[in-house]
Amino acid sequence: MASILKPGDSYSVHYKYKDHSGKPCEGWESFKTKKEAQERKITVEKELLDGTFLVPDTMTVEEMLYKWIPIQSTKHKWSPKTYTQSVAMVQNLIVPYIGNRKVQELRTYDIEKFYATLAKTPCGQYVHGVKQTLTDKQKKRLLSSTSIHEVHTLLKTAFSYAVEWDLIHKIPLPREAPKANSEERTIWDEKTMLAALQTIENPALHLAVHLSMILSLREGEILGLQPSDLDFDAADGRGTILANKTMQRANKDALEKLDPNQVYHTFPDRREGSKSSLILKKPKTKKSNRVLYMDQALEGRTADMAGKAEAGRAERPREV
């Protein structure tokens, strides 16, 4: 099944195999000593016999990641934001450092060195895959441990596909993920919330902050609310709000590559040549769809604002 030849000063192991399409191929591997060649011959014959032989492939990490992204984004219905962030991570934090490495040649030690390099890398060193010239001040602001942990998470998923594709036998990542130092967010207490509401003079902003504080609505959910989401007669007159959509800005490149059924509406561009669009889309998870109950004060302010908005629409001149 395999043979050892001695062309010159080295020893070569010659064997035949079939690629993924069933095409017959020949393999040649060179070694400095006869012992190394004999050990490789035994290994190759065993792998060819039990079906664990790894078909040689020159695919690089960059090629593998750009093959994986469309599959992963379609399979898991990525949002435009997730797609954009993942592509940016590949372009700026992975490809410049290990993108040209062959997937089959990458070892755990290489990934450990890669993580160590990222820990010393300034934020914004690469933008759209292009190296930037940074100021001395910018060079001091290094990538966070959270960013490096996110790179690890992305690579772990991508390399699991490489295993399924029979590119590699096992994921080359270290068992222990880079530690992410999470910072605890500070939350306003009751006095701060009350002071904020008493200070805000703009009615629309006041209502938005009120909705965020009382119902824990996110910014995109508040901006995505429509009159049909408000039911002032429900819950014995307390009123309810249906949160089932969110507004966000998304890159047009991402929108072209993702499931259009995720987007309810794309708003017209205000600037010609804009690379992003404002969209109204489905929430990230089904659990985000929920009915929320208003208190008396919130119900009154919401009803008042909804009435003014309706009156404003009625006063607009109709297009002829």
Range-by-range predicted roles:
Residues M1, M89, L93, R101-Y109, ...:
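N-terminal DNA-binding recognition helix of tyrosine site-specific recombinases/integrases
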Residues L5-S12, K16-E112, H128, E310-V320:
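N-terminal DNA-binding module of tyrosine recombinases/phage integrases
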Residues P7, T192, L225-D304:
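Conserved tyrosine-mediated DNA breakage-rejoining catalytic core shared by Y-recombinases
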Residues L65, I94, I111, L155-A158, ...:
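Conserved hydrophobic/aromatic pocket- or pore-lining residues that grip, position, or stack substrates
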Residues Y66, E105-T108, K120, Q198, ...:
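Phosphate-coordinating loops and pocket residues in cytosolic domains that bind phosphorylated ligands
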Residues K113-F114, E164-L197:
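Flexible interdomain linker/hinge and immediately adjacent N-terminus
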Residues C123-V127, Q198, N202-L205, L215, ...:
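Short, basic (Lys/Arg/His-rich) helix/loop patches that form interaction surfaces
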Residues T153-S160, H206-L223, T240-I241:
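Short pre-functional
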